[in-house]
From Swiss-Prot:
Protein name per its UniProtKB record: tRNA-specific 2-thiouridylase MnmA
Superkingdom of origin: Bacteria
Site residues (Interaction with tRNA), renumbered to this chain: 127, 361
Cellular-component GO terms for this entry: cytoplasm
Active site: 102 (nucleophile), 217 (cysteine persulfide intermediate)
Stated role: Catalyzes the 2-thiolation of uridine at the wobble position (U34) of tRNA, leading to the formation of s(2)U34.
UniProt region (Interaction with tRNA), positions on chain: 167-169, 328-329
E.C. number(s) listed in UniProt: 2.8.1.13
Reaction(s) catalysed by this chain's protein: S-sulfanyl-L-cysteinyl-[protein] + uridine(34) in tRNA + AH2 + ATP = 2-thiouridine(34) in tRNA + L-cysteinyl-[protein] + A + AMP + diphosphate + H(+)
Main localization of the protein described in the UniProt heading: cytoplasm
Biological processes per GO annotation: tRNA wobble position uridine thiolation
Gene giving rise to this polypeptide: mnmA
Amino acid sequence: MPGAEKILVAMSGGVDSSVAALLLKQQGYDVVGAYMKNWINEDQVIGHCPWQQDIEDARRVATQIGIEFRVVNLMREYRERVVAYLLDGYARGLTPNPDIMCNREVKFGVFRSWAKDHGFAAIATGHYAQRVEVKPDLVTPAVLGGLNADGTPASTFALLEGADKNKDQSYFLALLSQEQLRDARFPIGHLPKPELRRIAREAGLATADKKDSQGICFIGEVKMQDFLRAYVPDAPGPIVRATDGRELGQHRGLHFYTLGQRKGIGIPSNTDHEAYVVVGKRAADRALLVAFDHPDAPGLFQREVRVHALSWIGKPVTTARALEGRVRYRDPRVPLEFVPESETTALIRFAAPQRGLAAGQILAFYDGERLLGGGVYA
């Protein structure tokens, strides 16, 4: 019975997680809401971080739908597992993805562990993604699912894109494990956003018309460059045109730029109004390499790329095969050939050249709508 399952809902103070909690309550589950207090911007150096308002909004919604509400303090774990990863990556010239790491390490990591330690069967979030049960093959036992108490193979779970393709957030879950997915619930994954807003308004939820957050995971409405300026020292160097080696100016630090970036480089376009784009970084002299934004700009487009730190939600892909990939959030899935080189690395051959594949970012692998896993651009 649904009522036998106790679920802890990660309530961010936004409308998505509010409706997630509401739907689970309506379905008869034993629901408790919790706000993860991961960052409070105590030094006020990075601008607006509305955590206090978010807690109040989440608390108001919990009261409205009649569920218990808690605040779970995970600030130390967030700094150690997400902020440190973020700052270390940028300091090494990479372009990390804090949202994906936050999901793996915090939301479905330490928060999930906290929930299990406090008697919850599962956690739920407001992600636009869908979790489906995959029945085991009774001839070949499902190793990933393990065994039931009676010795029969246990089910495994697959992660599908959200039904609303404009809001799909499966990409951000690319590094989850089967164990993490087993304990996850995504109550709104089948809903289009307008329908979700309608449900929130009809229920009179305090967050029904609250705008969606666009900031860094759990930090708030903060631009990445502002965050980096607060915590990573400037390391100036030359801006160099890759095609002829001409120095065009100076930059404040390579960590402020990523491959494919056009805005904020700090050098004007030419007389034909052609914009410059970042095509690389040269660590030896801290040079930022740029070129005019053309299809033939050196280093801007890649047909082949290597990925490492492979992570699979289900059975690992161990032989060369055709898959689809999402090279960054909101980009469409594109066809590729996956060629494994080891358990943790692979060569990727795209059917068409891809733009701006920055080292440190995540490539998510799909089989149709099913998310298989992901890897990090080398």
